Amino acid sequence: MSISETTKIAIPEPREISTVPRFSDRVFRVVVSLGGISSLVILGAIAFFLGIRGFDVLSNTGIKFITQYEWYSAINTDGTAGEQASTFGIGAMLIGTIITALIAVAIGVPISVASALFLNFYAPTAVRGFLVSVIDLMAAFPSILFGLWGFNVLMPGGEYWAKLLHKYLSFVPLFDVSAPVFSRSPFIAGVVLAIMTIPIITSVSREVFAQAPLDRIQAAYALGATRWAMIKAVVIPYGRSGVIGGAMLGLGRAMGETVAVFTVLNIVFQVNWHVLLGAGGNVA
């Protein structure tokens, strides 16, 4: 008789591991669940309210409400009906919103990426902490402050830069104007929106760049790379997706801004492709 036949190995039976959540864990789960559900309910209620209130307009105008450029109300100032029929279209406003938002992103993204790289790899520790606090504080500023600052401080300087762009780049249709009116233009509105989006994009980019793999950074230095060469070869490729995400967040705020844009932009219900001219459309 062999040893294997006489020896029996005791195999333990599988056990079920169960945990009983603590009372604080259950309370936390209920609170978080209620918070998430309430957010969805509020968003659904807003969408339902807008749909109900705008159903008459959408049913009368159809897709023309989005594609049409005219906005005319047949109701006179005294409350009587006019001779022409009312026409409502937000096409020009949508195009103007996209133009100002793209100007803001084109100005804000390079400045934000450069600021994030400076904070992570060039700024001294004491200066870094102070600048990070200032940038985070700017992200919490209400939009009315940016609008008033843009109207009272930025607009005179913005007119000067707009005149320079028109003087040297007027051969580009975007920078050509039919009349020398440079105040309250889409360009100035885009600059104000860029200043508003810079803190958001900078914060996101800084956090992404800080997550770059340390072993790759050290390997780049070990191969003799300079700091800028290391940033180009390691940090920027690693954080490209995060920068794009931050730019999308900034674009979302730029497209959804109202008070600041209304303060510095001369709103007209027509498409203006000349960004230096003091007139432009916007959903605001």
Where are the language model's segments positioned?
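Transmembrane alpha-helical segments of polytopic membrane transport and secretion proteins
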Residues: 1-36
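Cytoplasmic-entry segments and transmembrane alpha-helices of multi-pass inner-membrane transporters
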Residues: 29, 111-150
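N-terminal signal-anchor transmembrane alpha helix
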Residues: 35-52
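Membrane-interfacial helix termini and adjacent extracytoplasmic/periplasmic loops
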Residues: 60-91, 146-195, 265-267, 277
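Transmembrane alpha-helix signature in integral membrane proteins
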Residues: 88-118, 247
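Faces of alpha-helical transmembrane segments in polytopic inner-membrane proteins
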Residues: 108-111, 135-143, 180-206, 237, ...
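Transmembrane alpha-helices
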Residues: 141, 201-205, 212, 221, ...
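Glycine-rich helix-loop "coupling/hinge" segments at transmembrane-helix boundaries
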Residues: 254-284
